[in-house]
């Protein structure tokens, strides 16, 4: 499984990258706004800064909701850096845009996916990644992990190349469940990634080892 960090915060991206296990970054307009990054030029400079930190894919989302606007924005974003993946919402114009980008050799991440049907259309259009939103489905008493599992099974059965990028991950437990469901990628907050390191037996075992060492070595 690949790990992406879901943030536009450069310090968090650097910290995750220093762990040595980071494969990429996902961003969205809300995350960019949270960091106070406004205006097209500032956003694009920020994407380039992210690409300088991380060697893997960086998802940059279009703002337009019409086909012509998506194509224009997507081509401009893709031209910024080879690692940019154009993030497109799973709406009718988005599927058409993904098909266009596929023909042009531009990689895409189909986002805001909440059903198997949406994931099917994204794969048929040639999306590089599809992003089912685990946490948001859980918020409405649906089963986000089960959706990930069903999409993985469908892609395996029909031999689609689209990678399942589990998104809206809220916890370390979500990551483990996505691993068990067979997701190709999990995009997570830094806290969830670091949470994978934590286990009480690791802490107690280390404390015992250090105490025993001090007994012998003073």
Curated annotation (Swiss-Prot):
Keywords: Cytoplasm, Pentose shunt, Schiff base, Transferase. Gene3D superfamilies: Aldolase class I. It comes from the Bacteria. The active site is at residue 87. It is an enzyme of class 2 (transferase). Transmembrane segments: none annotated. It is found in: Cytoplasm. InterPro entries: Aldolase_TIM (IPR013785), TAL/FSA (IPR001585), Transaldolase_3B (IPR022999), Transaldolase_3B/F6P_aldolase (IPR004731), Transaldolase_AS (IPR018225), TSA/FSA_arc/bac (IPR033919). Its EC number is 2.2.1.2. GO terms for cellular component: cytoplasm. Pathway: Carbohydrate degradation; pentose phosphate pathway; D-glyceraldehyde 3-phosphate and beta-D-fructose 6-phosphate from D-ribose 5-phosphate and D-xylulose 5-phosphate (non-oxidative stage): step 2/3. The keyword Transit peptide does not apply. GO terms for molecular function: aldehyde-lyase activity; transaldolase activity. Disulfide bonds: none annotated. GO terms for biological process: carbohydrate metabolic process; pentose-phosphate shunt. Transaldolase is important for the balance of metabolites in the pentose-phosphate pathway. Belongs to the transaldolase family. Type 3B subfamily. This is Probable transaldolase. It comes from Parabacteroides distasonis (strain ATCC 8503 / DSM 20701 / CIP 104284 / JCM 5825 / NCTC 11152).
